[in-house]
């Protein structure tokens, strides 16, 4: 029996889709509201199938896929592009290419974190003697955020679902420095994770003097001095 809990924010994050999938596989999970804290009654691997909805987080599908071989599970995925969702597709590619019988495997650098350095290089591009270069940038095509350099300078509109993953937050942070108004769309999932990140971005950019408007799950940012 495993009892899981976390910091207060973790108790707010939605877990229902993952818990429902595990219950479909035959596992008993006790939770008052399908969030942490919860108790999992483990029974070892048991073959079965389930469907997981990734509308609120693709991490649910990635977690199940990584354990599926040992568990004997067949995983169906629905919501927000399903199995073609960028982070789910990356997980599937990793599972396919990882050497099951041992060996050497090169782990790619994290493109989401690397976006900060591309952003810094873009901001400083006109400053003499301040070059920023990023070595060994991922080129496998697995990481959606490896597209970040191609989004500089920022386009008029960027979608979290189709254009960038977590690095869209880096793009939002530098948007006030752009030469034109920029829109960032389909940001809803950012509200559900470490914090309410859409609100946090709008609030903190406004503190710096940026003009930011929030309409539904879209942020619109005007260029200007900070």
Question: Across the structure, where does each feature detected by a protein language model lie?
Answer:
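Structural preference for solvent-exposed beta-strand-turn elements
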Residues: 1-226
């Amino acid at each position: 029996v495993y009892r899981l809990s976390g910091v207060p924010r973790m108790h707010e994050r939605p877990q229902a889709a993952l818990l429902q999938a595990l219950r479909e596989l035959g596992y008993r999970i006790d939770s008052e509201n399908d969030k942490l804290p919860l108790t999992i009654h483990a029974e070892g691997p048991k073959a079965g199938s389930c469907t997981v909805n990734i509308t609120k987080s693709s991490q649910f599908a990635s977690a199940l896929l990584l354990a599926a071989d040992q568990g004997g599970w067949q995983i169906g995925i629905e919501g927000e592009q399903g199995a073609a969702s960028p982070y789910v597709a990356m997980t599937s590619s990793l599972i396919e290419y990882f050497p099951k019988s041992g060996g050497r495997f090169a782990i790619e650098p994290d493109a989401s974190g690397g976006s900060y350095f591309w952003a810094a290089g873009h901001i400083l591009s006109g400053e003499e003697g301040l070059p920023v270069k990023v070595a060994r940038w991922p080129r496998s095509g697995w990481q959606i955020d490896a597209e970040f350099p191609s989004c500089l300078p920022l386009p008029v509109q960027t979608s979290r679902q189709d254009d960038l993953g977590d690095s869209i937050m880096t793009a939002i942070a530098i948007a006030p420095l752009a030469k034109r108004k920029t829109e960032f769309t389909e940001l809803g999932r950012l509200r559900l994770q470490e914090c309410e990140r859409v609100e946090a971005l709008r609030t903190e950019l406004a503190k710096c003097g940026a003009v930011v408007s929030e309409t539904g799950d879209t942020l619109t940012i005007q260029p200007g001095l900070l």
